[in-house]
Amino acid sequence: MPELPEVETALRGISPYLKNFTIEKVVVRQPKLRWAVSEELITLKNVKIVDLTRRAKYLIIHTEKGYIIGHLGMSGSVRIVPQDSAIDKHDHIDIVVNNGKLLRYNDPRRFGAWLWTENLDDFHLFLKLGPEPLSDEFNAEYLFKKSRQKSTALKTFLMDNAVVVGVGNIYTNESLFICGIHPLKLAKNLTRNQCFSLVNTIKDVLRKAIIQGGTTLKDFLQPDGRPGYFAQELLVYGNKDKPCPKCGGKIESLIIGQRNSFFCPKCQKRG
């Protein structure tokens, strides 16, 4: 599943081809995604795109009439292609602009979404989201206060979008390993020093992943078709039974919150 670095990579890749250009039309070949594609999209003609931003794992295309909100789901991707490009089986949506290009959304599993709102502040999917992990709002004191009385596994806690958005499974695994904290540690038992270390590490891991163009494991490619190279930097994620890069012991895995978790039992003591 594309996480924050992958979505940020997509945003940076598509923005130069869309910002300040005009939507000529939106072609919807498959409206049945996770939620039905908003009907307003197919009515967009001669509408200028004024900006592109991201909130959590949502792409936001700001137009002069409202906002197109895209989510890549489990297997979705976006790319910029010439308007005469051949259409593949899972190419569900095209946003055609007046520069000879179009934004094409491909999604084999159809768990993504393309929605419309005229008021971003009241958009229902954003109302309960926590802070952005790279923002100043996400800091050690915030994490410490948020974790009090939380008798849940730390890994699950960090992947809760009401706590902090977009960190995701891969980057939570990597951050906990770097900090030497067991993924099953109860959130309420975090110390202030551990919160300080975690916040700084999460920010550092995410920034590095963005620089590398995200992590390509299966479905994700950058908008220009290249893979994300952060997979080459992964320390524990997907490395079950391989040597720990710190101590040489064996990396183990277990299921936490229905997601695969990878850790070193020697370097990440539970407690």
Curated annotation (Swiss-Prot):
InterPro entries: DNA_glyclase/AP_lyase_DNA-bd, DNA_glyclase_Znf_dom_DNA_BS, Formamido-pyr_DNA_Glyclase, FPG_cat, MutM-like_N-ter, Ribosomal_uS13-like_H2TH, Znf_DNA_glyclase/AP_lyase, Znf_FPG/IleRS. The active site is at P2 (schiff-base intermediate with dna), E3 (proton donor), K57 (proton donor), R259 (proton donor). It catalyses: Hydrolysis of DNA containing ring-opened 7-methylguanine residues, releasing 2,6-diamino-4-hydroxy-5-(N-methyl)formamidopyrimidine; 2'-deoxyribonucleotide-(2'-deoxyribose 5'-phosphate)-2'-deoxyribonucleotide-DNA = a 3'-end 2'-deoxyribonucleotide-(2,3-dehydro-2,3-deoxyribose 5'-phosphate)-DNA + a 5'-end 5'-phospho-2'-deoxyribonucleoside-DNA + H(+). Its EC number is 3.2.2.23, 4.2.99.18. One of its GO terms (molecular function) is zinc ion binding. Signal peptide: none annotated. One of its GO terms (biological process) is base-excision repair. A zinc finger (FPG-type) spans 235-269. Monomer. Belongs to the FPG family. This is Formamidopyrimidine-DNA glycosylase. It comes from Haemophilus influenzae (strain ATCC 51907 / DSM 11121 / KW20 / Rd). The lineage of its organism: Bacteria, Pseudomonadati, Pseudomonadota, Gammaproteobacteria, Pasteurellales.
